[in-house]
């Protein structure tokens, strides 16, 4: 086995252990309590797991927290462009799905369970901050970063990391949207050599779910779709042409 692949697998297993261990303990302890206390225990155990994950992977430099190939004078604009890309891709996907009449919402007990898990302080922190950071550590920092260090072709590596990312986010339309998101953020990671744009985009994307633009007219969604596509294209073009000193990456 290639040393790079072996290291990637080991880091992924470490990440998976941290991702699962404390929430499993929290779920077991929570069985001795009634709702909503059991959900609070689970949410705080998830948060602690993410915090430990972040400390270990960034502290040990298993995943590098830097701006990579982004020129120093372009760091602030890169942050702004990351937010722009996050907002534009979110509105593009939502408006396209609305025009196609595709519902991403879970139903019944599963919907209620997920709503409870993202409510309260711990739930909001998990959904909007710590889960995005933890997922970027894994899917871009570990998997994509590891594959790019091997003989794997760039787009194959991006597609593999996006596929694994999507598999963690359900099936059907949720899988497709997560796959597209993973390809976009994976390309940015390859282009910049940095996990930071992906973290910013992921945090912004998850935070935007609090904005409700459902039950609008098709004209509204069409306008949002067109504007979003233009802004998204500009953001991608900016990272391709403006943010990087190509002589530093060659």
Residue map of PLM features:
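Structural signature of hydrophobic alpha-helical transmembrane segments
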Residues: 43-51, 123, 133, 170-175
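Residue-level signature of the transmembrane alpha-helical core
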Residues: 79, 83, 124-129, 133, ...
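Membrane-interface helix/loop boundary segments of multi-pass membrane proteins
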Residues: 134-160, 187-194
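Alpha-helical transmembrane segments and their helix-entry boundary regions
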Residues: 11-12, 39-42, 78, 142, ...
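N-terminal, membrane-interfacial amphipathic/helix-forming hydrophobic leader that caps
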Residues: 1-75, 87, 204-250
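Functionally important transmembrane alpha-helices
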Residues: 172-228
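Juxtamembrane helix-loop-helix connectors linking adjacent transmembrane helices
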Residues: 35-36, 65-134, 145, 149
């Amino acid at each position: 086995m290639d040393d790079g692949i072996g290291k990637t697998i080991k880091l992924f297993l470490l990440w998976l252990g941290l991702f699962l261990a404390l929430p499993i303990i929290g779920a077991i302890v929570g069985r001795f309590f009634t709702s909503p206390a059991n959900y609070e225990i689970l949410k705080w155990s998830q948060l602690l797991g993410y915090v430990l994950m972040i400390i270990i992977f960034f502290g040990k430099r298993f995943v590098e927290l830097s701006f990579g190939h982004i020129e120093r004078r372009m760091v602030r604009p890169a942050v702004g462009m990351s937010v722009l890309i996050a907002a534009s891709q979110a509105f593009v996907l939502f408006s396209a799905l609305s025009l196609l009449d595709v519902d991403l919402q879970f139903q019944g007990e599963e919907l209620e369970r997920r709503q409870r898990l993202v409510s309260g302080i711990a739930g909001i922190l998990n959904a909007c901050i710590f889960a995005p950071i933890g997922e970027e550590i894994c899917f871009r920092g570990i998997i994509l970063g590891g594959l790019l260090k091997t003989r794997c072709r760039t787009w194959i590596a991006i597609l593999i990391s996006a596929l694994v990312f999507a598999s963690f986010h359900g099936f059907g339309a949720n899988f497709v949207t997560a796959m597209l998101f993973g390809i976009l953020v994976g390309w940015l990671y390859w282009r910049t050599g940095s996990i930071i744009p992906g973290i910013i985009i992921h945090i912004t994307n998850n935070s935007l779910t609090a904005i409700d633009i459902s039950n609008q007219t098709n004209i509204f969604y069409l306008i949002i779709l067109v504007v979003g596509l233009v802004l998204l294209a500009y953001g991608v073009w900016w990272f391709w042409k403006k943010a990087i000193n190509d002589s530093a990456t060659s």
